[in-house]
């Protein structure tokens, strides 16, 4: 292997360079020698090149290196930079209207994140959640959650008057029904004023609606919502046959009768997009990348399934043959029955996975990078008969593998994804992840069970990996610690080299930052040292989830101690 020294402004490599190549003592060395230089250059970088380069010339072993030799230093690959970030969903921000939003608190958080030295903000899926608030069981894979729209930002855009805003409410946790009742009428009013207007904002709305990368999912979503609002059925499976199967005449009739609803739906999505892109652009200016999150599956009662039935495993009547889930695991003795329809991967392959290509393109529009939940489902997926009551009766089936990601790369170019590879991880999952270069995950709460070969222990981490103190599905560090028995605590304290447990949250945070993993992500709850009451989600439960908000006594302006502590640790472990 040869080492090429390349000046940043050299007009001709061959005219100014020779190449050094160390070989056996009896052989010659191909050397890169800068001619006619009297001062060392600071602008060299070292690269590996093939030994048969046409620029090579030879000198004998033992001859002097040029005076610039000590300047031939390797330049770090920017893609290998160590970094850290915080997991905090926008619903968890403080705010006056019952739910966090994309207003001032989002910008304050980015400023605070920048002050800590963190360079990643991870969010949960931004899609409309289900009635319980879960963003992993929403009705659309591409739409934004309009409850995240800031009413104050609508005032700034001239779409609402300040006097129209409701009286502030002090809600310690998110109540989605209350937030919807409080905010939705005003968001609708703002959307109507936008449609009726004629200014620059109206022009941007039309551009948004006509963008092919947007319209390919937005029109279906708008029609689906209009029909659903009109019929109020349990699912699209119960709709009249012409609507259920998307007869053109039936859709035209819906447009005529529901034009205002459809136009308002699209305008609301534009308002979400506008506010989110403002937040994202501000984060970019502050050196913060936004990491999104994408559930692998979509809900049955969704525009995605209704408009793309051929891409899902449905019977002739449109009902799921098989549904999603996972076998028994750490979270459930009978497995988790998610109930989403499964993809017909063979049908998807026949049109080059166009549905997935469009979905990833949408993710690129929203995020700088994206975690894909349940990545293992691309290698092999757990299929449960739709009539089953528990997931444990399912079977493993072969997934699309690398062919899906080849099609995505061909369709949208280079993508940055993080593979959520927790649970039952077989060899084919590891091979698939490595074949596409995606980092996997390690979770420190899983590290202290088993022996020294536990893959979640820091000494077993990989460089191309994202380490978490815990995810949205875990308890907080403090809450998790309180559930451990004394033997487990003693083992963890010995590994973490701590004598006491008073500061256990920060001890685990430090362990995450010290990991060899390139990226470390810490939930905001752990930075605040909160207990189980701040847990975001408990898998296999249906109530009491997705409601956590930053305590009213906490402001990003008074988190200087936490900011300084984070920055010190990031500096210590090379993550600034």
Curated annotation (Swiss-Prot):
It comes from the Eukaryota. InterPro entries: Glyco_hydro_77, Glycoside_hydrolase_SF. Disruption phenotype: Increased amounts of maltotriose and leaf starch. This is 4-alpha-glucanotransferase DPE1, chloroplastic/amyloplastic. One of its GO terms (biological process) is maltose catabolic process. One of its GO terms (molecular function) is 4-alpha-glucanotransferase activity. NCBIfam families: malQ (TIGR00217), PRK14508.1-3 (NF011080). It catalyses: Transfers a segment of a (1->4)-alpha-D-glucan to a new position in an acceptor, which may be glucose or a (1->4)-alpha-D-glucan. Belongs to the disproportionating enzyme family. Chloroplastic alpha-glucanotransferase involved in maltotriose metabolism. Probably uses maltotriose as substrate to transfer a maltosyl unit from one molecule to another, resulting in glucose and maltopentaose. The latter can then be further metabolized to maltose and maltotriose by beta-amylase. Required for normal starch degradation in leaves. Keywords: Amyloplast, Carbohydrate metabolism, Chloroplast, Glycosyltransferase, Plastid, Transferase, Transit peptide. It is an enzyme of class 2 (transferase). It is found in: Plastid, Chloroplast; Plastid, Amyloplast. Residues 1-45 form a transit peptide. Its EC number is 2.4.1.25.
